[in-house]
From Swiss-Prot:
Name this polypeptide is given: Putative tyrosine-protein phosphatase OCA1
Catalytic reaction list: O-phospho-L-tyrosyl-[protein] + H2O = L-tyrosyl-[protein] + phosphate
GO molecular function terms listed in the Swiss-Prot or TrEMBL record: phosphatase activity; protein tyrosine phosphatase activity
Entry keywords, A to Z: Cytoplasm, Hydrolase, Protein phosphatase, Stress response
Residue numbers annotated as active site: C99 (phosphocysteine intermediate)
Gene: OCA1
Origin species: Mycosarcoma maydis
């Protein structure tokens, strides 16, 4: 039986999001044929997941260490930009973007990616809230998404 990781979702073809998987989820992830994982949490992923990435020849980009050691700190613009620069490179795909629960940090990066796709803000925030669940959304993350300047990714010609 294939079991997806918590808060798993397909963002686009070959672009997935989730919370940190455990061993039960590894057979499911194998089917995705991942080339890259973008890990947004400040702490290291679980050792079993690190071993899985090595065994599957998946490149792990640990961006979370760049901004904080506190899991409650909001994601920084620098980390979002680094994640988006990876996400606009075809060589990164298939890719999984994840943090511990696949909610706030992952949702912020996906929300900014949606801005690059020219989604309207209400649709972006609805998707963010759907993965966060209930009233657990963070207004600072929503403001970050709303105010995020897409030109920082591609330059003024965008």
């Amino acid at each position: 039986m294939l079991v997806p990781p918590p808060n798993y979702g397909m963002v686009e073809e070959n672009f997935y999001r989730s919370g940190q998987p455990d061993q039960l989820n590894f057979p499911f992830l194998e089917k995705l044929g991942l080339k890259s994982v973008i890990w947004l949490a400040p702490e290291e992923p679980e050792p079993g997941f690190l071993d899985f990435c090595v065994d599957q020849n998946i490149e792990l980009h640990h961006l979370g260490v760049l901004y904080s050691t506190n899991a409650w700190d909001p994601i920084t613009e620098e980390v979002v930009l680094q994640a988006l620069h990876l996400l606009v490179q075809p060589a990164t795909y298939p890719v999984l973007v994840m943090c511990n629960l696949g909610r706030h940090r992952t949702g912020t990066v996906v929300g900014c990616f949606r801005k690059l796709q020219r989604w309207n803000l209400s649709a972006i925030l609805e998707e963010y809230r759907r993965f966060v669940g209930g009233q657990k959304y963070r207004i600072l993350n929503e403001q970050f998404i709303e105010l995020f300047d897409e030109e920082l990714v591609f330059g003024a010609s965008y």
